[in-house]
């Protein structure tokens, strides 16, 4: 990271011995960096937070409560879309559950909203070969039959930043199609059907900006 993330993490690590700051010897890219963290982590659950996003203070507590009741492998939550200044744009309320077929049509999981069992991530990693490495992993987990359940409360502020990977709609669409065809090996008709639904959901989700 070229911003102050490391310094901020270092400060909090000095206050709490449970926090460990790991520095890459060189820029390894987002997928390999996350995978390194997965391999080192010792806890039962793993949560991710992208540097642009904000967790609400009770996010982990509420997701763990759902995990205890539901016995799920993946817990995800609803989120608020905010702009670069933190101003509210819209809310995205996730469905109670999702599946492989549902995730083909609309991805309700995102890095900053998921809580995953560590055992899963010992066997499944982000691929550095794909632009949408997170979406490719979510599909893989669903295909393997892991159970995902929602905490439907808004527990994350998801920041929409001009020029970010997620804000480039045309490039996102291109790589979504490649995942359908090259990674999941879907037929042309099934890919087209999933892509059309994905596009319609995207227009609805981002209609306010």
Question: For each predicted feature, which ranges?
Answer:
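A conserved acidic beta->alpha catalytic loop
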Residues: 1-8, 26, 50
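Short aromatic/hydrophobic "clamp" motif used to bind/position activated sugar donors
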Residues: 46
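Conserved donor NDP-sugar-binding/catalytic core segment of glycosyltransferases
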Residues: 58-89
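The conserved acidic donor/metal-binding loop of glycosyltransferases
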Residues: 50-54, 78
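Short alpha-helix within the catalytic core of nucleotide-sugar-dependent glycosyltransferases
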Residues: 6-7, 35, 43, 56-68
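Glycine-rich, basic loop-to-helix element that forms the pyrophosphate-binding segment
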Residues: 24-41, 62
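Conserved nucleotide-sugar donor-binding catalytic segment
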Residues: 39, 97-171
């Amino acid at each position: 990271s070229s911003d102050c993330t490391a310094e901020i993490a270092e400060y909090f690590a000095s206050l709490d011995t449970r926090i460990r700051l790991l520095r890459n010897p060189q820029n390894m890219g987002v997928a390999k960096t996350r995978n390194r963290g997965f391999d080192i982590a010792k806890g039962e659950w793993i949560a991710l937070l992208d540097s642009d996003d904000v967790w609400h203070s009770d996010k982990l507590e509420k997701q763990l409560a759902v995990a205890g009741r539901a016995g799920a492998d993946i817990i995800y939550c609803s989120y608020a879309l905010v702009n670069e200044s933190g101003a509210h744009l819209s809310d995205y309320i996730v469905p109670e559950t999702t599946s492989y077929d549902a995730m083909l049509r609309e991805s309700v999981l995102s890095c900053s909203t998921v809580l995953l069992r560590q055992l899963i991530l010992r066997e499944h990693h982000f691929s550095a070969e794909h632009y949408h490495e997170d979406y490719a992993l979510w599909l893989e987990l669903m295909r393997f039959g892991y159970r995902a359940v929602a905490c439907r409360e808004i527990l994350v502020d998801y920041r929409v930043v001009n020029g970010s990977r997620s804000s480039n709609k045309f490039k996102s669409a291109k790589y979504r199609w490649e995942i359908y065809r090259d990674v999941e090996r879907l037929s042309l008709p099934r890919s087209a059907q999933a892509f059309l639904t994905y596009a319609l959901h995207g227009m609805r989700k981002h209609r306010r900006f």
